[in-house]
Each structure stands twice: as C-alpha cells, then as structure tokens.
C-alpha cells in the first residue's frame, strides 16, 4: 500500500519466516492524522519514526498495540501465537509463494476498495494454504488519510463476493491473472516484474 511505511527489516523478516504451504499475515500500526502529516522523509530514512519514545513525544497514546513496535524474542512469539486476530491476507503486509498465488489466480478484478485482499486470502485458505500470524514481527506504519474513493455500493459488492467465496469454498477467480479464455493453458513468468504470458 502506498500509505504504509515498512521498517528496514520488513522484507528480510518476511523471507526469514516463510514456510511452504503457508502465507504470512502481518498487520500495521495505525497513526493519527496529525502524526501522519507530521512525519518527514528524514524521520523515515533515519528510522526514528519507528521509535516508540519518539512517537510518544509526538502525541501517540499508550496502547497494547504499541507492542508491534517493541516486541522481541519470546514476547514476540507469544503475541504472534496467541493473538485472537485471524491470520488474513492484508494488502499492506502479507506474502506468499508464487505457485500458490497462481493456483488461485491472484486478486479478483471485480473488487474495488474494501476487502479485495481478504477475499484473495480466503481463496488461498479454500485451496489449503493457511495464514501464519506475524503481526508482531513485521513492523509497518499506516498513514491516515481521507478515503474519497470509498462508497457504500463498492463495499456491499465486495461483501457479496466474499460471502460467495466463503460459502461456496471458491478457490479460483476467472477475473484474475489469467482470464477465462486462457485457463488450462500453459502460463509462464518471464521475470519477477513482467506480466504473465501465454506460452506459444
């Protein structure tokens, strides 16, 4: 997400914690609107925006959620293991294996803002790939902002799609990476950043 600031060990932690047959489910630490506007590029590059004392000095209140910034060792493991929060695919902080992503055909392009990442994770779960909670291991700050693109119609549409995905145990979307006319045909990845293309 473009409204998130990952800590410098974000990607390396995802790589370290990866497990076959699982996807990783992280979270974020949501900042107030005032603090979101106050953070500078230098605060990010220096890493001070991840320092709890610095953030408290900027007005962040005491909260259990601050453990996301400070937990280490056994405490981090315990918080990840026993959190009541379900391990879901969260667009701001999640990772999975390419083979699993292709197996469910990625995101459903019918969906707009509000739950499109969760629906993708629900299809992974239906496919047998279960989430692993790492919300206290991968630190990601979320900048608050207005959401003019959020509408009641889009939210309801997404809820209906998710309800069907869960109820019918849907694994594959026909409106994802590979469109219906290519399903069942060989697909290859030219490089990490290239689009998927049909093999000749």
List where the protein language model places each region:
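Catalytic beta-strand/loop signature of glycosyltransferases that borders the donor
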Residues: 27, 110, 131-139
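Conserved nucleotide-sugar donor-binding catalytic segment
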Residues: 90, 97, 104-112
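Acidic donor-binding loop at a coil-to-helix junction in glycosyltransferase catalytic cores
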Residues: 92, 113-120
